[in-house]
Amino acid sequence: MAINQYGVNFNGRRIVHPGAYGSIDDSAMVVTSDGSSNIPIVIGTADSGKSGEVLWYTGVEDARNELGGGDLPQALEMMFSPSPEGGGGASLVGVIVANKTVPATATIGGVKFTAAEYGEGGNKIQVKLEDGSIPGSKKFTAYKWDTQDLDTFDNIGSVMSVAYTGTAKVAVIDVVVTDGVATKIETKVGEDAENLTVDLQLDLTNERYSTIEAVAQYLNSVSDYSASYVTSMSLELESSKLDAITGQDIKTKSYLTALKGDLEFRISQYADLVDVEVTGEIVNFDNTYLSGGEKGTTPASWSDYLDLIKKQYSDILVVLTDSEAIHAEALAHVQQMENRKQRQMLFVGGGKGEAPERAIERASLLNSSRAVLAYPGIYHSSYYSGSRELPAYFTAAMIAGRVAGVSQSTPVTFNKFNLVSLGRDMLAGDPEIDQLITSGVCTLEKVKNGAIRLVQGITTYIGSNNTLLREISVRRTADLVATSVEQTLEDTFVGKKGVSTTVSSVETVVSDTLAEKVRTEDIIGYGDIKVTFKNTMIYVDYEVAVVEPMNYILVRSHFVPDTGQFTTEEV
């Protein structure tokens, strides 16, 4: 039975797990988490790619190869390279395919083949099994006709050749298989077949002989024997996969085989197009297409995918949908993650052609310092050569990519973006832009030279003019600083002895951690560090002046008539 009085109460919740925990006080920020790692995770649809797990990419090319088309590869292109000059975005992005992709399969010739590519693309793969170049072996071919990708493996099954080079007139080899597992290799030699004696015995259950490579090396070390590999691809195959052999002549070169094991091993290790599972007796078959691959449908709820993110370290979440229900799920996830010591920010957007009033309505439903609503829809050169509008959730992805491409304390206000046009004419100075900004909508605008820029990097929080709650960069900096202090204290002190010098040691660690943030220009300064040690608890309070963006430059230009008080001479 759980005892609910264990642990401590802090910041409105009960803490049982030992560690360093924190809260952020923003009460002193009027007009005046965890720590960000600049790693976004994006949830959306794709033509291919395995659903139900986080896939990681460092560039858009690999993503397009694996995901095909759809929202995800399009968004990744914009997240990796949001700036007009190229680049300027995320360096690593996690992806979750929301639609339930299904790989194509085919079961034939005693083998089940499954496309490595999830989705309809696997239906374009054909497989074939025929006799190999070495008698008794097989040759496997997989071909994808639209990309002309080819996997081909010859001499499958023939893993090693063995020959007896001694003076005996007869030499044979046995491979003993017990319950489907090869357990022993034994050679016998003699003057005739009726008078053979055991010459060598290898216990394959001994780790010394656990692979084909190890067996071959041992045989080559023994006089009167020679062995060679058929292909280096099979060197690491377990010797326990060898097929049974009884009395096979080795006076001339003979082959040890492992047809089932070698087929599964080589294809699983080296094939790009398919995976295999041997289901019965392996026999040849002609070219056969895989079938049943589907893009799949997208569920109405993405809660299962959000649960996957709880096991990842990420500070930026993008959901590629205009569904307000999914936006609400994602925001609830982000709020929950703050209590799990993984502070995150959510970036979302609406659909195509939405009016400003609709965007304002969406922002009001979120109203959080951890949620960013982007507007309007956009035209990007990579999507139908810039001739078709992308929904505003792509705008959110692009802004998230830029946020991931700069330090946490760097504002993204007035950053320019690599776009052809906007889905709605938003010109600098339009009154509706002011209305959007004051309503918590992160808005793009077009300036005189045709460039497109972000008006202000803001969250959907609508309340006091508190930059920690309103500004993306200040919110992320607070997360970074708070988590850095908490993590450093946890790593340094939790589980250690509390002694007379503990308070001063904690003060020093906090001071050193904050001083580093001053050096990196994440904060302006810090002070008032207070540490209290009571029983098993250490209470730490401190104050930090965070770096805030310069949003307004107010210039008074005074023009007066010339009455002789000004000099006209060059200095």
UniProtKB/Swiss-Prot annotation:
Its main location: virion. Transmembrane segments: none annotated. Pfam families: Phage_sheath_1 (PF04984), Phage_sheath_1C (PF17482). InterPro entries: Phage_sheath_subtilisin, Tail_sheath_C. One of its GO terms (biological process) is symbiont genome ejection through host cell envelope, contractile tail mechanism. Polymerizes as an extended structure around the baseplate-tail tube complex. During ejection, the sheath shifts to a contracted form, thereby making the inner tail tube protrude through the host cell envelope. This is Tail sheath protein.
